[in-house]
């Protein structure tokens, strides 16, 4: 079924920055996708095209990317007359039109908007939900797997004030009997955490960050983990609710001396307290003994390969590569060869097309890695990643706290999918690391 119209415009993301929205029309109607954007971005990811005109949107405009859809990608794709159900052919066509290694010419944000809108049109033409279409494209087996929602309830690092260096502390309801129950456990724990934070750190500690987590004036990871453990206990889930961290350590790595500065937000940070990777690894090991931590993302900097491989040998928890791999097939291959991690953080806008995202997941699965599908800190009401996580059987999703509509939009979509699939779906639960094999 041919595409009759493709039109892009700019809309705003959850941080008030412009982003790209693409409308695509076929005989089945209008299919729309909005592209997200990240705050702490890895230097190896696909190019998000921004205008750089400081007189508008502080340089973050996307008029050029929008124009690239309206004058190049759209017209050329319509002219090519490709079948919207053939996602691979469409994405290869878009990649070829751009012609650069990391989509610098037309912008990954322009290309991804078109790619995701095409996927929605393809699903509509087949008369199936998007997750079913993604499942066909990825060739995943049935039953469907519903993901464990990793809920980012406490923020530090670049996402918050206070001296806390680690960026995200997540609660993980892997022992829940279903997705909906896991989400309920998370919401109840989040409410307990919020009231504890206000009690201990004052009213403003209840304010939420970009992803809906609270950001009290906390100094150390231990202090954060104590507070979360207390909230879990108050909610009645001690022993059942697990914890995960995204350290985002590239943000506080001192490349010149190859050390990690946990006091990086203090301009007078004392270099004698900076840690070698062995010392930082020992700190993580201590924390995992003390608290029910099941997953650590970006424990080391994005090019500190030696540290990753060292830590990998000593740990059996999930080690998630985000800045290290940025969903890039070449980086993923290297991480697998160097035995640096055992799970991939999949962000569709880091690579720029649905086909490449699916391939990144498959490459990771092939080596026994887990895959966690992720939102970005600049999100929108678009829920495509909810369908992707179910379609590729990833078994884990990270999409913020159970707060702020752009985060809940994804979680609510998975609730709908759970209801629709009924007994044709299983909850990944404790098997979230190997859900693709369930």
From Swiss-Prot:
Pathway: Carbohydrate degradation; glycolysis; pyruvate from D-glyceraldehyde 3-phosphate: step 4/5
Binding site for substrate: 159, 168, 297, 322, 374-377, 398
GO molecular function: magnesium ion binding; phosphopyruvate hydratase activity
One term under GO cellular component: phosphopyruvate hydratase complex
CDD domains the record matches: enolase
Active site residues of this protein: 211 (proton donor), 347 (proton acceptor)
Pfam families the UniProt entry points to: Enolase_C, Enolase_N
Primary localisation category: cytoplasm
EC code: 4.2.1.11
Name listed for the protein in its UniProt record: Enolase
């Amino acid at each position: 079924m041919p595409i009759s119209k493709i039109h892009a415009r700019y809309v705003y993301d959850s941080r008030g920055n412009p982003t790209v929205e693409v409308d695509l029309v076929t005989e089945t109607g209008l299919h729309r996708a909005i592209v997200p954007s990240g705050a702490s971005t890895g230097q190896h990811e696909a190019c998000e095209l921004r205008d750089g005109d400081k007189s508008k949107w502080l340089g973050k405009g996307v008029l050029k990317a929008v124009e690239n859809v309206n004058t190049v990608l759209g017209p050329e794709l319509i002219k090519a007359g490709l079948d919207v159900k053939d996602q691979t052919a469409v994405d290869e066509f878009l990649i070829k039109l751009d012609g650069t290694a990391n989509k610098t010419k037309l912008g990954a944000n322009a290309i991804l908007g078109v790619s995701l809108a095409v996927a929605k049109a393809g699903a509509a033409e087949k008369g199936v939900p998007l997750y079913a279409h993604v499942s066909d494209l990825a060739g995943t087996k049935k039953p469907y797997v519903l993901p464990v929602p990793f809920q980012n309830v406490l923020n530090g690092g670049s996402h918050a004030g206070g001296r806390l260096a680690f960026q995200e502390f997540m609660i993980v309801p892997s022992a829940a009997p279903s997705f909906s129950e896991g989400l309920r456990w998370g919401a109840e724990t989040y409410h307990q955490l919020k009231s504890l934070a206000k009690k201990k750190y004052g009213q403003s500690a209840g304010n939420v960050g970009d992803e809906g987590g609270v950001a009290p004036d906390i100094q150390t990871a231990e202090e954060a983990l104590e507070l979360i453990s207390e909230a879990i206990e108050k909610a009645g889930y001690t022993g059942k609710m697990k914890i995960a961290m995204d350290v985002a350590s590239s943000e506080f790595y001192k490349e010149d001396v190859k050390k990690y500065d946990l006091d990086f937000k203090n301009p007078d940070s004392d270099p004698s307290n900076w840690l070698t990777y062995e010392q930082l690894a020992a700190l993580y090991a201590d924390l995992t003994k003390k608290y029910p931590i099941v997953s650590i993302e970006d424990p080391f900097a994005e090019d500190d390969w030696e540290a990753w491989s060292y830590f990998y040998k000593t740990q059996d928890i999930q080690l998630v590569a985000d800045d290290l791999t940025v969903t890039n097939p070449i980086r993923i291959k290297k991480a697998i060869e160097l035995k640096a991690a055992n799970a991939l953080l999949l962000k569709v806008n880091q690579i720029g097309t649905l086909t490449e995202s699916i391939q990144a997941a498959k490459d990771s699965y092939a080596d026994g890695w887990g895959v966690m599908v992720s939102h970005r800190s600049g999100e929108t009401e678009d829920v495509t990643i909810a369908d992707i996580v179910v379609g590729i059987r990833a078994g884990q999703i990270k999409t913020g706290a159970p707060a702020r509509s752009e985060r809940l939009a994804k979680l609510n979509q998975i609730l709908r999918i759970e209801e629709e699939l009924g007994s044709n779906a299983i909850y990944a639960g404790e098997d979230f690391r190997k859900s693709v094999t369930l």
